[in-house]
Curated annotation (Swiss-Prot):
One of its GO terms (molecular function) is urease activity. It catalyses: urea + 2 H2O + H(+) = hydrogencarbonate + 2 NH4(+). NCBIfam families: PRK13241.1, urease_gam. This is Urease subunit gamma. The keyword Hydrolase applies. Its main location: cytoplasm. It is found in: Cytoplasm. PANTHER family: UREASE (PTHR33569:SF1). Transmembrane segments: none annotated. It comes from Cupriavidus taiwanensis (strain DSM 17343 / BCRC 17206 / CCUG 44338 / CIP 107171 / LMG 19424 / R1). Its EC number is 3.5.1.5.
């Protein structure tokens, strides 16, 4: 199987998000890479499902709360930008203050 660098990146994000999801389900607080991966994967999947950029900008703020992450992590992530593939092409989704 041959994958482009972009496809490899998507697979890596998905794998990290899956790990983060499992750790969160066990009650563990997420670290920086886990939090970013989980939010990023949610945005990418939402785009694939056909949601709009505006919907995903809002949805990105509902994936995690401060209680889900280690101390100081929310402040380390002022925004997340994701180039997501929508049915009509690739668009940049920016989520400001993703962890409230």
């Amino acid at each position: 199987m041959e994958l482009t660098p972009r496809e490899k990146d998507k697979l890596l994000i998905f794998t990290a998000a899956l790990l983060a999801e499992r750790r969160k389900a066990r009650g563990l607080k997420l670290n920086y890479p886990e939090a970013v991966a989980l939010i990023t994967a949610a945005i990418m999947e939402g785009a694939r499902d056909g949601r709009t950029v505006a919907e995903l900008m809002h949805e990105g703020t509902t994936v995690l709360t401060r209680e889900d992450v280690m101390d100081g992590i929310a402040e380390m992530i002022p925004e997340i930008q994701v180039e997501a593939t929508f049915p009509d092409g690739t668009k940049l989704v920016t989520v400001h203050h993703p962890i409230v």
